[in-house]
Amino acid sequence: MKVLLTNDDGFHANGIKVLKEIVMAAGIASEIWVVAPLSNCSGCGRSVGLRHAIEVYKVSDTEFIVNSTPSTTMFLGLKEIVGEKPDLVLSGINSGVNIGNDVTYSGTIAAAAEAAMMSIPSIAISQEYDGRSGEINWENPRKFLKGIVDMLLGAPSWDKSTVMSVNFPLISAKGIKFTSQGKYMPYNKIEKKKNAASSISYTIHRTAPDKDSRGESDDSIRALDDGYVTITPLKFDMTDFDILESLMLLNEGCNI
């Protein structure tokens, strides 16, 4: 099986190195490629590089660095770099979870979505970490990821245009739960600084809200807080079909 690894934290991030170690140790791939951004692109969502030259650096025959966003990196990886399309794309392991409303900001999920648009099985992988110490424990992915990949690839109901988003908790995981995305808006602290000139600079700091305000029992937010690995299927047709149906009924009675 040909597996393509990518991320949004950058080619030199620890998470993608750990991911490659896990894939190699699991023996699930006969061919492993790494195509990742040059620098950290956290929070860039599905932004793309247009109308300017994008440099690609060859590290080895199967490892490449792209000086662009995760979505662009994946697009070029699939269209120009890896040749025959991979059997699986793994995006991560992201430093920090991608849950609730954060999924639309996530470059990790965006890279996986780019592959899913081409009907390639794609899994976005994220690891919660201690925001105070900054330490990341990779034991949960090492323990659970192979089994999760095997299980998902064997799922006949998996529409390959759907991204599977896997989030690992900070503590030793109790098990796995399939969950909904949930609603989660992190607390944003804005630091304001007046510069010597006439400009003002702002720094936005993102922190998690109190756990009591974080989610329902069946969503990824609450399940993570309870110590479970969460698996959430994400589709990127963002149409609200309930509202669409009501608007279509409304339109029937209008003379516009």
UniProtKB/Swiss-Prot annotation:
Main subcellular localisation: cytoplasm
Top-level taxon in the UniProt lineage: Bacteria
EC number(s) from the headed UniProt entry: 3.1.3.5
Record field: catalytic activity: a ribonucleoside 5'-phosphate + H2O = a ribonucleoside + phosphate
Note accompanying the cofactor annotation: Binds 1 divalent metal cation per subunit.
InterPro entries referenced in this protein's UniProt entry, alphabetically: SurE, SurE-like_Pase/nucleotidase, SurE-like_sf
Residues given in the record as a divalent metal cation binding sites: D8, D9, S42, N94
GO cellular component, one term: cytoplasm
SUPFAM superfamilies documented for this protein: SurE-like
Subcellular location, record wording: Cytoplasm
Gene Ontology molecular function, alphabetical: 3'-nucleotidase activity; 5'-nucleotidase activity; exopolyphosphatase activity; metal ion binding; nucleotide binding
Enzyme category, top tier: hydrolase
Keywords tagged on the record: Cytoplasm, Hydrolase, Metal-binding, Nucleotide-binding
Record-linked Gene3D superfamilies: Survival protein SurE-like phosphatase/nucleotidase (3.40.1210.10)
Cofactor: a divalent metal cation
Family membership: Belongs to the SurE nucleotidase family.
Biological role stated in the UniProt entry: Nucleotidase that shows phosphatase activity on nucleoside 5'-monophosphates.
Name under which the protein is recorded: 5'-nucleotidase SurE
Gene assigned in the entry: surE
